[in-house]
Amino acid sequence: QLCLLQPLGSGGFGSVYKATYHGATVAVKQVKKSSKNRLASRQSFWAELNVARLQHNNVVRVVAASTCAPASQNSLGTIIMEYVGNITLHHVIYGTGDAWRQGEDDEGGCGRKALSMEETVCYSCDIMTGLAFLHSQDIVHLDLKPANIFITEQGVCKIGDFGCSQKLEEGLSQSPHVCQQGGTYTHRAPELLKGERVTA
């Protein structure tokens, strides 16, 4: 039912692969067991499932998840998500990754076109729409950065990588430290940096 095709990338808590699941192309994240910080690894896996039942055009959809994995994989579990490609907003802004946005009107002198005002507005609207939806579901993404915004072939931005997210119970959080082990320090929410509780 699940067949891994090729690696797409890896991060602090696991690896992501392009795969097929029941014949459909998907992305598969295998959350690795961390010998140094098992609690953080577990938190990352369960945080990814905060969006498991949500469907929104600007949020990467979780298709399925399992905690069953062969011992040889050293994995806490597997998360199967919709495949949205491997281009992120980081690639678009900084011109990294695959040959992206190659063009003749190279404004920066580095072999890529600058984002147009129209693209900038469209991407911003997609991200804000996705965030507003997540907040309406009491979910806070605690590692929102260009590398976690995926851009589809149709040019739609989707928020992904929820390994450092939090579901606010009854609109409040009593644990500001939930994801301080993970996430990107330079993109961390101000309230986390101050040691305050997470807000939406």
From Swiss-Prot:
Domain of life: Eukaryota
Pfam families assigned to the protein according to its UniProt record, in alphabetical order: Pkinase
EC number per UniProt: 2.7.11.1
Domain Protein kinase span(s) in chain numbering: 2-200
Reactions accelerated catalytically: L-seryl-[protein] + ATP = O-phospho-L-seryl-[protein] + ADP + H(+); L-threonyl-[protein] + ATP = O-phospho-L-threonyl-[protein] + ADP + H(+)
Keyword set, alphabetical order: ATP-binding, Kinase, Nucleotide-binding, Serine/threonine-protein kinase, Transferase
Catalytic residues (positions): D143
Residue numbers binding ATP: L8, G9, S10, G11, G12, F13, G14, S15, V16, K29
Keyword ATP-binding applies: yes
Gene3D superfamilies named in the record: Phosphorylase Kinase, domain 1 (3.30.200.20), Transferase(Phosphotransferase) domain 1 (1.10.510.10)
Entry's family note: Belongs to the protein kinase superfamily. Ser/Thr protein kinase family.
Protein name: Serine/threonine-protein kinase mos
Originating species: Vultur gryphus (Andean condor)
Name of the gene encoding the protein in the UniProt record: MOS
